[in-house]
């Protein structure tokens, strides 16, 4: 699963996801992709589940790029612990995703196979997302 090798700080503030994604909102590597339509904290497990679903559907053909990285540590307090007494310990890692962000890109497969692979991957994600095609793609 994806997580940073090392970080400057062990815990980060919660923050808010506001506005649309301007950086990373267009296809840069592949011909097809998955674009997020909602804001969310995408966990490393969710990213990995979507990646596995996509690569299995493509039968190891083509190439997949993951365009989001889980670099935000999400903390959690143990069960049955009273409020207060400081922040909990880091539990898992998440990527902050804004609407319009490209999550995955695919190259080297047929458009029908890419559409099916992304459909399966989107089902693994807890948000609305859509299949996108590069503007220079010619359907041969």
From Swiss-Prot:
Signal peptide per UniProt: none
GO molecular function, one term: tRNA binding
A single cellular component GO annotation: cytosolic large ribosomal subunit
Keywords, in A-Z order: Ribonucleoprotein, Ribosomal protein, RNA-binding, rRNA-binding, tRNA-binding
A Pfam entry, by short name: Ribosomal_L16
UniProt entry tagged with the keyword Translocase: no
InterPro entries tied to this protein: Ribosomal_uL16 (IPR047873), Ribosomal_uL16_bact-type (IPR000114), Ribosomal_uL16_CS (IPR020798), Ribosomal_uL16_dom (IPR016180), Ribosomal_uL16_sf (IPR036920)
Biological process annotations from GO: translation
Annotated SUPFAM superfamilies: Ribosomal protein L16p/L10e
Record text on subunit structure and interactions: Part of the 50S ribosomal subunit.
Cited function: Binds 23S rRNA and is also seen to make contacts with the A and possibly P site tRNAs.
Protein name per Swiss-Prot or TrEMBL: Large ribosomal subunit protein uL16
Lineage, highest ranks first: Bacteria, Pseudomonadati, Bacteroidota, Cytophagia, Cytophagales
Gene responsible for this protein: rplP
């Amino acid at each position: 699963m994806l997580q940073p090798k090392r970080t400057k700080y062990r815990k980060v503030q919660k923050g808010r996801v506001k506005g649309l994604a301007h950086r990373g909102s267009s296809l840069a590597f592949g011909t097809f992709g998955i674009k997020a339509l909602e804001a969310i904290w995408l966990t490393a497990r969710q990213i990995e589940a979507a990646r596995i679903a996509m690569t299995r559907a493509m039968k190891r053909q083509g190439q997949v790029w993951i365009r989001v990285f889980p670099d935000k540590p999400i903390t959690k307090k143990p069960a049955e612990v009273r409020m207060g007494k400081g922040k909990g310990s880091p539990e898992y890692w998440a990527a902050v995703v804004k609407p319009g962000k490209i999550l995955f890109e695919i190259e080297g497969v047929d458009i029908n196979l890419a559409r099916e692979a992304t459909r399966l991957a989107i089902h693994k994600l807890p948000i609305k997302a859509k299949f996108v095609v590069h503007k220079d793609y010619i359907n041969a």
